[in-house]
Structures are given as structure tokens and as C-alpha cells.
């Protein structure tokens, strides 16, 4: 067997076995209500989002079974607004069994199937390599005017350089902080070249929210140029908000389930694939569906590449198709449920789930592919290797004022990041000294509850972000709506006008910026903000901390006025968070 193929398959086997042995990767979702509408079952589940392919059902004392047609079920849709999961029973006996055991009905999300999909994908492949074939625009013998590279005057020098490299080099990485133009400038212009050349490309992202964020940005830009939305096709299950706004770009197979009366649901997937030039999907959807799509892509674009596990990104290395990675490796790394302390000996293969897509070049420069190869002992923050990768850095951000950009550059980026002249609104609220208990800080929660109603009057785009799951639950007890609270990890891929940050405590892994993992996590929290950042903390404690990112924020921040009486804590407990919502339960 090919040594690379063997390494990839071993990684899948080792990681799957670890999750199975430690009962990880599978979470029970809280069932709040069950309603029968023969032959359909409507189940209200407390979860923000679901992967329909991961769902399993337990009826009575019988072991959980997949919610798929093989076992007599058909998942019609999941409406995240109403939190209703709609299932069709294909067999009356199955429906009777569910009705009989209604009170014992349980729903699980088992994400281990994604590993099985990866394994099946690699089993069918025999060629693995960094792409050598350049994009079509690099062919000097082309006489087509469409195949020339055009950089518009509005691009700055770094953006123009990145665009030229994307369209002429087989493997490239565009690194930039939020607001540097990775998506709305560089990616958009690159895709525009392919659209004008009538050439199909693929846009990928590690999560549904990240995919929809990039597609929304692109659709708005295409709309301004009067380019038909039918040029874009989003495969997989979209959020309700995305479907309502952009139904014409959604997967017709999904539309037929959720919006059967929609004009766009009458089109077949085959015809949509034929007419679309930009196909968007998650990397997991690519793994599962690529073989059945029967299409060829001229270029792969992987957004949020630093959050994408290396082993999933390696699926793109099987086609000798140009690859462009876009992202920011100074933010969150992939979520791996296997501790690195267990990745040794014959378990070292699993490190491919721990490292990010940015280690692709490193992976292919290994002298051998045994479990002792250097790639299997690297950490998420090991130096990146870019000898054959065309690296472009975007140092100018229009998201932040130069006041915040300088802080970010000093503590996190170290690459000369600079921002716009007008400063970012940075505020702090001193909640006085109150020692945190069990990763909860009542003083911070109480202050946030005081200002939250006022903030909501100014903008509905308000998020309260905290590193800790327990603090998020506490915020709910203080009457902060659950859909406005996020953990740092859960907020990845989201954007808000106003971000209120509750640090709770100085914690080595999540708020102590001397630890690079914590610094990158704090960068995520700050970068969710578009206009205003409010830090709620014990001012006297944090201002005394040396070389801390949050301390630097405090030095530049202004006091935020509080006028209302603090609300009292609610007595009821918040809904339990599933593993899908809060990925890292710290």
C-alpha cells in the first residue's frame, strides 16, 4: 500500500478507536417536545445547529440507530429558529414503536461518522501530492484575453500580489487579520477571473457558519456587478436565515425538503451543477460527496484553513488541482478530542487530526511515513514551512483602528499589522474584586446583565463572549438571552457589531496571552467585533498584570457608563449545552 495512504488510514483508525474507547464524539441532545403528524415526527431539540448526517435515535431500551432510510427514517429538515427536527417514518411499524416509547425517546449526534467518511475517501485514492499544475491563467501560450490577470486599482499592493500568486501558482496561502480583504477583495477577484473565464471552482470551509459567511460576502459583491446568483451553488444543508435570503444558490435537493413550493426547488442538482461556476461546501461535504458529483474543479479555495484539520485538507491533494488556503493561523486551531499526551507510539498517527491545513507542505516533505516521522510530533504552534507554498501576508486591516491593530500586532501577529486612522471603540467596565468560583464570575455577569438591555436597543447584533461554558450558563441565569451568549470557540466564524467580553479569570489556556494558545483564543474573541469592544473585568487586578493582551486593551480603553440597577439572578437553570454548541467544555 502507498505509504502516505497507509498513514492517512492509520490516522483515521487510531482516532476513531480513541473516540469510541473514551465515549467521545457522540452527544445526547435534549428533547423538549415530540409531536406526531403521521407519517412525520416533529421533535423540538435544544441545539443551535445540527449535522443531519450525524443524527441517531434511541427508541426505548434498544441501542441507538442512525436516522437514515436504511433504518426506516428520512430527515426532512431542521429549523434552527424553532429548533424543530422533522423526521418522516418510512415504515408504519417504526412510527408505532416511536409512539409507544415517546417518553423514552432520545436523539444523539454522533460525529464519528465523519471519520468513517474520511477513511472511505482515502481508500479510493492512490495519488497524494502538493499540486504541481498551475492555474489556467499561468499558461503563457494562451491567447485568450479572459485568461490574463487583471488587478483592479482599488487593491493595495499586498492584495494585488496575493491575487497574482493565486492565479499563477499551484499552491498558495493568503494570511491576513480580519478586515484585511482576504475574502471580499482577494478571493472575490480571483473567483471573478474564473467566472469570466466560464471555469468551475470550489470554495470550501471547515464549518457551515464559516461557509455561509464567505458565501454571503461573495454573493453581495456579485450582486453589485449584476452577476446571476445561479453562478453560485451551496451544497449541503443551509441555515434557515441563509436559505430565506439566498434560496436560489441553495442545494435543490435540500430545497425540495424544506421549501417544496419554491421555484428554485424544481431544478435538478445535475442541472445546477452544470450551470454553476462556484460550488461551495464544507470540507466534510466534499469528503462525502465529491466522488458522486461527477464534476471537475479548476481550483480549490479553502477558507478558515487554520481551523481545518490537516487530514481533511489532504483530501484536496488527490486531484493535482491548484489549491489556495485563506485564513489566519493566529486564531483558533482545529478541535481535536484526543489529547496530544496520548499521541505517541502507534497512536501518533492521530496528530493529523490535531494539526491544521497549513502543515500540508510539511506533511509532503517527510523522509518517511512511519509513526516516528517528524510530522507526528509537531504541535499546533510549531513553525510553518513555506518553501513550495506561495505565502502572501495582508498587513493592512480596515476592521480595526490603528489603536487596536498595534496591540494585536505587539501581542499576537508580530508582522507589522496596521489599521485605519479612526480608532476602534474600546471600553471597560470595572466590576470590582470578586474571586471567581468554579470558572464563574458573578460580578462580571451582573454588570453585563445591567448594560445588556441598553446595548440591545442600539443594535440587535450584540454578543457576550466568554472563555468558559459555565460562565455562559451563568449569564443565562442573569437573564442574558442564550442566543446572544457564546464561548470563544463557539463564536468562531461569527461577527457582531458589539462584543462584550467576560474573561472570568486569568487562565493559562484561554486568557493568559503569554501562552500562544490563549493569545490566539483572545484574538478570536476580539475579532468577532465590527465596531465596539467592551471588556468587563476586575480593573485593579487586570491592570497590574504584566505583558497581558487584555491589560493592553485596558490601557487604551475608556470607562463605559452604567446607569441602571443591577438585575437579580434568575432561579432556573439554563438549557444544557450540547457538544455541538460548545466544543471545548473548559
Annotate the PLM regions.
Residues 235-241, 284-288, 466-470, 485-492:
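Conserved helicase motor
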Residues 138-245, 273, 278-413, 541, ...:
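ASCE P-loop NTPase helicase motor core
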Residues 259-316, 485-489, 502-524:
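Conserved RecA-like ASCE ATPase "motif II neighborhood" in helicase/translocase motors
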Residues 242-257, 405-411, 433-434, 497-503, ...:
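Short, surface-exposed amphipathic charged segments that create phosphate/polyanion-binding patches used
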Residues 1-161, 227, 235-258, 351-355, ...:
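Pre-ATPase regulatory/linker segments immediately N-terminal to the P-loop/RecA-like helicase/translocase core
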Residues 415-478, 484-485:
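Conserved helicase/translocase motor-coupling segment
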Residues 341-389, 424-425, 510-586:
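Helicase C-terminal subdomain and adjacent C-terminal extension
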Amino acid at each position: 500500500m502507498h505509504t502516505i495512504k497507509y498513514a492517512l488510514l492509520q490516522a483515521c483508525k487510531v482516532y476513531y478507536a480513541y473516540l469510541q474507547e473514551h465515549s467521545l464524539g457522540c452527544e445526547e441532545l435534549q428533547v423538549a417536545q415530540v409531536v406526531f403528524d403521521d407519517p412525520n415526527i416533529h421533535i423540538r431539540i435544544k441545539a443551535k445547529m445540527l449535522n443531519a448526517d450525524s443524527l441517531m435515535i434511541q427508541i426505548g431500551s434498544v441501542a441507538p440507530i442512525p436516522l437514515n432510510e436504511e433504518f426506516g427514517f428520512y430527515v426532512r429538515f431542521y429549523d434552527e429558529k424553532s429548533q424543530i427536527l422533522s423526521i418522516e417514518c418510512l415504515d408504519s411499524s417504526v412510527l408505532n414503536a416511536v409512539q409507544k416509547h415517546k417518553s423514552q425517546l432520545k436523539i444523539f449526534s454522533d460525529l464519528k461518522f465523519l471519520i468513517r467518511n474520511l477513511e472511505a475517501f482515502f481508500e479510493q485514492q492512490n495519488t497524494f501530492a502538493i499540486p504541481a499544475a498551475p492555474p489556467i491563467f499561468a499558461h503563457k501560450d494562451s491567447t485568450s484575453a479572459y485568461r490574463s490577470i487583471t488587478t483592479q486599482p482599488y487593491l493595495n499592493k499586498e492584495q494585488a500580489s496575493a491575487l497574482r500568486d493565486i492565479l499563477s501558482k499551484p499552491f498558495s496561502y493568503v494570511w491576513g487579520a480580519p478586515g484585511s480583504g482576504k475574502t471580499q477583495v482577494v478571493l472575490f477577484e480571483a473567483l471573478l477571473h474564473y467566472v469570466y473565464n466560464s471555469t468551475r471552482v470550489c470554495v470550501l470551509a471547515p464549518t457551515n457558519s464559516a461557509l455561509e459567511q464567505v458565501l454571503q460576502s461573495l454573493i453581495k459583491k456579485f450582486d453589485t456587478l449584476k452577476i446571476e446568483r445561479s453562478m453560485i451553488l451551496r451544497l449541503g444543508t443551509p441555515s434557515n436565515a441563509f436559505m430565506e435570503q439566498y434560496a436560489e444558490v441553495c442545494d435543490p435537493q435540500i430545497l425540495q425538503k424544506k421549501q417544496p413550493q419554491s421555484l428554485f426547488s424544481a431544478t435538478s442538482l445535475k442541472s445546477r451543477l452544470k450551470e454553476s461556476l462556484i460550488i461551495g461546501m464544507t470540507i466534510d461535504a466534499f469528503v462525502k460527496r465529491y466522488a458522486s458529483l461527477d464534476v471537475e474543479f479548476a481550483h480549490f479555495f479553502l477558507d478558515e484553513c487554520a481551523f481545518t484539520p490537516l487530514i481533511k485538507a489532504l483530501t484536496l491533494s488527490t486531484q493535482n488541482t491548484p489549491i489556495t488556503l485563506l485564513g489566519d493561523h493566529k486564531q483558533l486551531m482545529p478541535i481535536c478530542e484526543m489529547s496530544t499526551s496520548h499521541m505517541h507510539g502507534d497512536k501518533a498517527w492521530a496528530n493529523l487530526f490535531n494539526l491544521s491545513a497549513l502543515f500540508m507542505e510539511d506533511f509532503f516533505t517527510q523522509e518517511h511515513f512511519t509513526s516516528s516521522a517528524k510530522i507526528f510530533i509537531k504541535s499546533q504552534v510549531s513553525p510553518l514551512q513555506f518553501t513550495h507554498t506561495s505565502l502572501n501576508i495582508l498587513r493592512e486591516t480596515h476592521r480595526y483602528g490603528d489603536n487596536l491593530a498595534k496591540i494585536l500586532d505587539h501581542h499576537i501577529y508580530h508582522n507589522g499589522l496596521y489599521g485605519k486612522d479612526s480608532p476602534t471603540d474600546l471600553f471597560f467596565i470595572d466590576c470590582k474584586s470578586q474571586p471567581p468560583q468554579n470558572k464563574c464570575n458573578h460580578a462580571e455577569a451582573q454588570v453585563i446583565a445591567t448594560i445588556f438591555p441598553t446595548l440591545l436597543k442600539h443594535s440587535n447584533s450584540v454578543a457576550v463572549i466568554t472563555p468558559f461554558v459555565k460562565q455562559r450558563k451563568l449569564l443565562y441565569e442573569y437573564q442574558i438571552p442564550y442566543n446572544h451568549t457564546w464561548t470563544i470557540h463557539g463564536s468562531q466564524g461569527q461577527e457582531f457589531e458589539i462584543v462584550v467580553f467576560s474573561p472570568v479569570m486569568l487562565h493559562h489556556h484561554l486568557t493568559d496571552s503569554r501562552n500562544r494558545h490563549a493569545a490566539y483564543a483572545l484574538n478570536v474573541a476580539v475579532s468577532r467585533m465590527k465596531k465596539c469592544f467592551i471588556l468587563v473585568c476586575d480593573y485593579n487586578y487586570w491592570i497590574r498584570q504584566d505583558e497581558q493582551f487584555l491589560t493592553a486593551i485596558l490601557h487604551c480603553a475608556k470607562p463605559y457608563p452604567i446607569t441602571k440597577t443591577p438585575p437579580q439572578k434568575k432561579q432556573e437553570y439554563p438549557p444544557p449545552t450540547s457538544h455541538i454548541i460548545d466544543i471545548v467544555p473548559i
